[in-house]
Amino acid sequence: LRASASEKSEKLLTIPDGTHIECTGWQSGWAKTTYEGKTGYVSAVYLLYDGKVRADGGLRLRSGPGESYEKLLTVPDGTVLPCISQGDGWVKTTYNGKTGYVSQDYLLVPVTVRASTGLNLRASASETAEKLLTIPNGTVVQCYGNKENEWARVAYNGKAGYVSYLYIAYD
């Protein structure tokens, strides 16, 4: 756990492997969290999360991170998969004893809105984009697809759009 979102910042403490933490925000690839009374940042490289498959007909588990890689098997819609690592729109995961990659676009991850006045859902990943609606504080929404800069793609009340990563927490 570091004091700021940087490898060079002060190390506050070490969080044991396998510990469940709540992410209360994001900054340049770092998750903000509180552990043993200390608030700081953990590199997202060291975090695992679960995602739920949302693909009619299932999701292809591939041997590598791309559509050109061999299809190992199909993961059924609704299956919850562990995220081992991620990058360039692909998540490394395991299913039925096989390790491979799935497209991040077809995984749903529950996140909770952490903004006292609610969080604006925007048409695109920009503060100046059209505001579609406001999601109330404490609402759990499904985050899916790739992170675009500091924005997460979510759906709420039948509308899809983007919210700032600074105001969501992974459950």
State each model region's role.
Residues L1-K32, R54-K92, R114-W151, L166:
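Beta-loop motif signature
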Residues S6, E22, K32-K52, T94-V111, ...:
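Boundary regions of SH3-family modules and the immediately adjacent low-complexity/disordered segments
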